[in-house]
Amino acid sequence: MITELHGIDIRENEPLKHYTYTKVGGPADFLAFPRNHYELSRIVAYANKENMPWLVLGNASNLIVRDGGIRGFVIMFDKLNAVHLNGYTLEAEAGANLIETTKIAKFHSLTGFEFACGIPGSIGGAVFMNAGAYGGEISHIFLSAKVLTSSGEIKTISARDMAFGYRHSAIQETGDIVISAKFALKPGNYDTISQEMNRLNHLRQLKQPLEFPSCGSVFKRPPGHFAGQLIMEANLKGHRIGGVEVSEKHAGFMINVADGTAKDYEDLIAYVIETVENHSGVRLEPEVRIIGENL
């Protein structure tokens, strides 16, 4: 128990595999669940004062945490998940579930968020990665975000300053952490929005191995190619290392089929990169983030 942070939900030596989509990850020294910005500021101020590292994990949907875990503080925004509407502007805290947020937009007959209706993760992670699917991406509707700097300052970043690119945003370099974001939506027809979301979710269910733990799409799309196609052409569908294998359903996904570890994921990613490059001459670049310490 850290007496200076009394009243905040903090768990010591907590295995992170219970909180990641891959179901892998070693322990965090301290796993914190702030309920508001004040508690978040207290955690960051304490960590900075004690020279302890800290990071925000988000919903960990496109992330692999190594088996040795993470030192210092890991902060999760599960309790910072409010969503508000002001006219056609939707504002969501970073911990808000992305899929649930798209449902709120649909309920109010607001269009623009349909592309994200099946993307797992949080609002904060979606902004960080400029998440996208089926021709849409966060940058198309993004207005601004409140972020927490490494020094503990809260500031607002505009769409221009976010410098979005393919699965990229400026905060990947600055280290700023999204705590809330605003999006510009448009009035639409509820039935039309609902039908489009149903169509996209049906496509996702047909093509993606949603029944297994995974980190989503593992690799960025190489120019002029599709990662899944290159992996399939290299005869890697079903290839397995430890408990992790390349999905038979979609070669761009790696699934945890038998108590796999983060090392299994890393070894399989490295093997796929090398094999695909030898086969096609194209070097795949991971989209998934890998953090933490090895055992």
Curated annotation (Swiss-Prot):
Enzyme class: oxidoreductase
Named cofactor requirement(s): FAD
UniProt keyword terms in alphabetical order: Cell cycle, Cell division, Cell shape, Cell wall biogenesis/degradation, Cytoplasm, FAD, Flavoprotein, NADP, Oxidoreductase, Peptidoglycan synthesis
InterPro entries hit by this protein: FAD-bd_PCMH, FAD-bd_PCMH-like_sf, FAD-bd_PCMH_sub1, FAD-bd_PCMH_sub2, MurB, MurB_C, MurB_C_sf, Oxid_FAD_bind_N
Catalytic function, reaction form: UDP-N-acetyl-alpha-D-muramate + NADP(+) = UDP-N-acetyl-3-O-(1-carboxyvinyl)-alpha-D-glucosamine + NADPH + H(+)
EC number: 1.3.1.98
Organism superkingdom: Bacteria
Transmembrane segments: none
One Pfam assignment: MurB_C
Record-annotated active site: 167, 217 (proton donor), 287
GO terms for biological process, alphabetical: cell division; cell wall organization; peptidoglycan biosynthetic process; regulation of cell shape
Domain FAD-binding PCMH-type: 23-188
Record localization: Cytoplasm
Predominant cellular place of this UniProt entry's protein: cytoplasm
Any GO molecular function: FAD binding
One GO cellular component term: cytosol
Pathway: Cell wall biogenesis; peptidoglycan biosynthesis
PANTHER family cross-referenced by the UniProt entry: UDP-N-ACETYLENOLPYRUVOYLGLUCOSAMINE REDUCTASE
Family under the similarity heading: Belongs to the MurB family.
Function: Cell wall formation.
Protein's name in the database: UDP-N-acetylenolpyruvoylglucosamine reductase
Organism lineage: Bacteria, Bacillati, Bacillota, Bacilli, Lactobacillales
Gene it is expressed from: murB
